Design a protein with these regions (language model features):
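Hydrophobic anchor at the beta1->P-loop junction of P-loop NTPases
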Residues: 5
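Glycine-rich phosphate-binding loop used to anchor ATP phosphates in small-molecule kinases
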Residues: 46-98
């Protein structure tokens, strides 16, 4: 099963993904920030976002093709990006109304040596602002999350995913 966890920056995508994989056996996890880092691709144009969705799809399809579950967490701001990824299941983290880079993410980015940008400046940049502007409400959502879930709620969600 290929699961997309999407939503605005700071909505809790990574937070949820890292908790879900603890309850799903044989499950890979790909985080967009790490995939971008290792690809050294920091293009947030429409084309760059589609390329990132296709890159995430490639990793996810590899895992799924080898009989594994996979969770990918990334903004996937447009229907086109979500369609390019072609998930089996969509979790929309609708916990905030405007994306932001949370302080823990800024701290994490500071420890990456090869970033071609200043993380603090990115959080105030046009590209980051554009993410809020271009984000389209997903038309296909299997689970719509509007709050940060408790451990029990996350376990229940993982059980629901396994039974799909």
């Amino acid at each position: 099963m290929k699961i997309l966890v999407c939503g605005l920056p700071g909505s809790g995508k990574t937070w949820l993904a890292e908790r879900l994989i603890k309850h799903i056996k044989n499950c890979a996890w790909y985080n967009a920030d790490f995939v971008r880092k290792f690809s050294n691709d920091w293009d947030f144009s429409v084309e760059g976002r589609i390329r990132q969705a296709n890159r995430m799809k490639t990793f996810a399809d590899f895992e799924k093709g080898n009989g594994r579950w996979v969770i990918c967490d990334f903004v996937a701001p447009t229907e086109k990006a979500r369609e390019a990824f072609a998930s089996d299941y969509v979790i929309w983290m609708d916990t905030i109304k405007e994306g932001r880079i949370v302080s823990s993410k800024l701290s994490e980015l500071k420890n990456i040596n090869n970033l071609p940008f200043d993380a603090n400046l990115l959080s105030q940049s046009k590209e980051f602002e554009d993410t809020n502007k271009v984000f389209e409400t997903p038309s296909k959502v299997d689970t719509h999350i509007t709050h940060f879930m408790s451990d029990d709620e996350i376990k229940k969600l993982s059980e629901e995913l396994i039974s799909v």
